[in-house]
């Protein structure tokens, strides 16, 4: 006689089955916290270095030109800060002190309501200038105080926008704006500064400020500036918000992506001559009904193409993978329901915080009307499929009551682990907060710092690291991202237990350098100099390109096309070979009806004449989350909504708020 079934076990079976399927439907939040707060030991709140004030954008550059990075903070109702890591004290210390004799005194700019900040070399002297976007007494349109562009001159930092030559030219912006970013639009090594203004009707178009070489005399310290936005094709009227720069559509030239408010996004494709054409609509990233905030660029699925991630204010967040269909570039949103869940987002940061090879995405939210915790996701690459998006535990960086306004990543203490610095403000004065990672201490890493022909940081350059086992990893040297911010000018690679084989840098002018990475160079910082003409005449040295790649005649690593190799790599039951970046896949010879063709992996038929496949089947859990996200987004658009503290009602009179909200 068979034993009777345990009734308790029978009741538990449905619950166990539910637990079994939950991780499959959506990446579950891991219990291990990613970050630990170290503010009290590294940057304790005080009057001089971490005042309780309204802060906004944050940038990373070498302010004192000693080879180490400083963290520059835009202070809105207080001074701007320049934080330097003191290795003896193991603390961040503000070097922009309130002493007129200090070479950094002018950077404080106590009168300015600074909101955005960026740094780059605009005159080719090898040292980065620092631009602060001020938005005094204005949410949009005309402000009452100009922006500042600081240059190290006469042994101190001075504002060159207030120079007589530039005052006469009327270059200094009096328009309210948000983000600023640096773009080497012609590949000259001299940068222009893109200013995302917040237009009011036909007042306050976006600007593009750069040095006028014909009117400048650098030997006498005269640096004449001009606005070339109209000439370059980027003079647009919009509610400018986030900006990010890099070779998005171009192979090397710097393109510009802007996520906007109350209007479509811009994707300015560099024509190769420093002029741009907006390709956002044709590429599928215009998102005209949402209100963009933080944005970042990365290659999330490691296919060698630059992808875009950004957050929408109380709207669905986007994770766009770049695709190529019949030779046309399109972006496809792969955001999961949890990832896309609307929130009052400000900063979006992409980095490998635990050095495990996979990129994380950090959403810095502002506690708006109620608590709003920050969120963290890992994007896990999958062979021949979309990445898996897994929600993580931010640990101390959760900050449910934080009024998040900005943030950056940098390794200020040189331990190979990225540190996270967050700024707060707008509706409540709060000090900065600093976090260190808790995971991945034993993982390998490599940091690459390319230089321009003048020796400055090569912002906008593309860095590809070829590895022994995990293929190619791509990074863009940041020229502005996050929202109001600019990350460190470093390509930081976490490698897990893998090792680098070679590295390749492509500058905005198309020049390239490839070199092997010795095993002894792991877990270090590599500086890559701009190539000299004589370097290109030498025979290329043999490169170790790693699995899936091989050295070509031009001396650089390229994807190996396994599909043309002999013997044939695919089995008989899957005879169609599809070459992919660093790999290949085999699929069946699927037959499709007229007007359709097999998709890339041969698992389905897709339309060739504009037909769209039906919606993907979703599990009950994913469907519920999708419905919840749609409901939240609908609620956000069905009634008057506050957009950064301002009613989004068009011409209707707006509620009072901080002008820079």
Swiss-Prot record:
Principal localisation: secreted
PTM summary: O-glycosylated.
InterPro entries: Crtac1, EGF-like_Ca-bd_dom, EGF_Ca-bd_CS, FG-GAP, Integrin_alpha_N, NOTCH1_EGF-like, UnbV_ASPIC
A single cellular component GO annotation: growth cone
Keywords: Disulfide bond, EGF-like domain, Extracellular matrix, Glycoprotein, Repeat, Secreted, Signal
Protein induction: Up-regulated by BMP4 (at protein level). Up-regulated in mesenchymal stem cells undergoing chondrogenic differentiation and by BMP4.
Domain named EGF-like: residues: 559-605
Signal sequence extent: 1-27
Cellular compartment(s): Secreted, Extracellular space, Extracellular matrix
Domain of life of the source: Eukaryota
GO molecular function: calcium ion binding
GO annotation (BP), single: axonal fasciculation
TM helices/strands, residue ranges: none
Tissue expression pattern: Expressed in the interterritorial matrix of articular deep zone cartilage (at protein level). Isoform 1 and isoform 2 are expressed in brain. Isoform 1 is detected in lung and chondrocytes. Detected in cartilage, bone, cultured chondrocytes and lung, and at low levels in heart. Not detected in osteoblasts.
Cysteine disulfide links: 563-577, 570-586, 592-605
Positions of FG-GAP repeats: 46-88, 105-147, 283-333, 395-437
Glycan attachment residues as annotated in the record: 608, 618-619, 621, 626
Protein's UniProt name: Cartilage acidic protein 1
Gene: CRTAC1
